[in-house]
Design a protein with these regions (language model features):
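C-terminal outer-membrane beta-barrel translocator/porin domains of Gram-negative envelope proteins
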Residues: 22, 26-187
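Transmembrane beta-barrel wall of Gram-negative outer-membrane proteins
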Residues: 1-34
Length: 187
């Protein structure tokens, strides 16, 4: 559901969506920490955006700015589960996280015919958990490093966002405690 806002100007939009995903894993071997079981993701997303591009396909002036928030219910608050002793399949039966994304693009024509254009852009993201015991699960994560294309089919299936970074091998800047799914190694 979305609508164009009239304040502060006509370039603003607000969109909302609700989503449910079921990850049914059977003999899945891709570093998730479990290979059999079901994980459920129920999310609410809202996006506030401002788009003032002169053209959608090949913009030569204007800007495109958005802030998006994706939230799941804090299932760890409702479930009676000891996360310290639970298996990964039990921990991630109901996936929980909050994910924030900010994107900005600005197009500036460098000549009068708008044939030469400077594009400045920024892309920020943050994912967090509601509980330090539950941590962030293996789904909907950010992977940094490499060409930005290496995730392939697994990245699509698991909702992973791959962020390319030249000078590094694929997935080489992923935190070393990834196997703990966001939990601290300090005990």
């Amino acid at each position: 559901l979305g609508r164009r806002l009239e304040w502060p100007d006509n370039y603003f939009t607000l969109t909302n969506s609700v989503s449910y995903l079921n990850y049914s894993l059977q003999d899945w071997n891709s570093g998730l920490g479990f290979s059999n079981g079901n994980a459920n993701s129920f999310t609410f997303n809202t996006t506030l955006a401002r788009r003032s591009l002169d053209q959608i396909m090949y913009p030569s002036s204007g800007s495109d700015i958005s802030l998006s928030v994706t939230l799941t219910p804090p299932f760890s608050r409702f479930r009676n589960l000891d996360y310290a002793t639970a298996t990964p399949a039990e921990r991630f039966k109901w996936i929980e996280y909050h994910k924030w994304m900010f994107d900005a693009k600005y197009y500036l024509p460098l000549d009068s015919k708008k044939k030469l254009v400077l594009e400045a852009k920024a892309h920020f993201g943050f994912i967090g958990s509601y509980s330090t015991e539950a941590g962030v699960g293996p789904f909907e994560r950010f992977y940094l490093g490499g060409d930005g294309l290496a995730g392939g089919f697994n990245a699509f299936l698991l909702g992973q966002e791959i962020i390319g970074l030249r000078g590094y091998e694929n997935n080489q800047i992923t935190p070393p405690d990834y196997a703990n799914f966001g939990r601290s190694n300090n005990g």
